[in-house]
Regions:
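Helix-to-loop junction immediately C-terminal to a conserved catalytic motif
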Residues: 51
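ABC ATPase NBD coupling module
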Residues: 67-82, 96, 100, 108, ...
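C-terminal boundary and immediately downstream tail of ABC-type ATPase nucleotide-binding domains
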Residues: 228-249
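Conserved ABC ATPase "signature" region
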Residues: 115-130, 241
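Conserved ABC ATPase signature
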Residues: 135-139, 143
Length: 249
């Protein structure tokens, strides 16, 4: 069986800056895969390249058996792959109600039964129908991120790209959103690719991970190896030290 997502020798260049350098990863169906590294390491750029939001200068992306080159993505792709961004307020139109925000992807993809789907999506992320006609500024940060997750889920994708989905939230809310995401992944049998600078989060959420530095993958390991401190690169050890609250098993 082919991987749910496979990236082969992917490169992204902005002007003369190499944001990604021949990056390769393979994520299996139903797996939660982590990308970690310091700011500017290329982890978010990799997600954006997969989503068609960054210019690809070399390499290829495979979704199941479909090969993607360049940055153009089809409706079929966005039905299968959705992205949740770091800043929930910035990713939600401030002048649209939650109802409108959730209706838009359904309209784009020609999906019927919008009322039922919107109600079900809000219920799945722990928000009731009472939130349906509110605006983003009327919600807390955690509630806005739940709406962003509902918007991604409403078209029933098989892969979620999660770009630091809890880093903009208060610590007390982070655990709630992470537990929600994990429950959704198990219930829907989704594939996750999660970017985080917090190794504790990745150990909790992901089975395997790739460590990135200066646009390249420098180490690959399982979450068990990371938790046990069985790492090979000094850079990875420094990331462990920098992750406050990270405790080895």
């Amino acid at each position: 069986m082919s991987a749910a997502l496979q990236v082969d020798n992917l490169s992204v260049v902005y002007d003369h800056f190499h944001a990604l350098k021949d990056v390769s990863i393979a994520v299996q169906h139903g797996e939660s895969f982590g990308l970690v590294g310091e700011s500017g390491s290329g982890k978010s750029t990799l997600l954006r390249a997969v989503a068609g939001l960054a210019p690809i200068s070399g390499g290829a992306i495979h979704i199941d058996d479909e090969v993607l080159k360049g940055s153009k993505r089809s409706k079929v792709f966005y039905r299968r792959v959705q992205m949740v961004f770091q800043d929930p307020y910035g990713s939600l139109h401030p002048r649209q109600t939650i109802d409108r925000l959730l209706l838009e992807p359904l309209a784009i993809h020609g999906i019927a039964d919008s009322d039922k789907r919107i109600a079900r999506a809000l219920d799945e992320v722990g928000l009731g129908n009472g939130f349906r006609f509110r605006y983003p500024h009327q919600l807390s940060g955690g509630q806005r991120q739940r709406v962003a997750i509902a918007r991604a889920l409403i078209v029933e994708p098989s892969i979620l790209l999660l770009d630091e989905p809890t880093s903009a939230l208060d610590a007390s809310v982070q655990a709630e959103v992470l537990n929600l995401l994990e429950q959704i992944r198990r219930d829907r049998k989704l594939t996750f690719v999660m970017v985080s600078h917090d190794l504790g989060v990745v150990t909790h959420m992901c089975e395997r991970l790739a460590v990135m530095r200066n646009g390249a993958v420098v180490e690959r390991l399982s979450s068990q190896e990371l938790a046990a401190g069985a790492v090979h690169e000094d850079y990875t050890r420094n990331l462990m030290i920098a992750s406050k609250g990270f405790v080895k098993a």
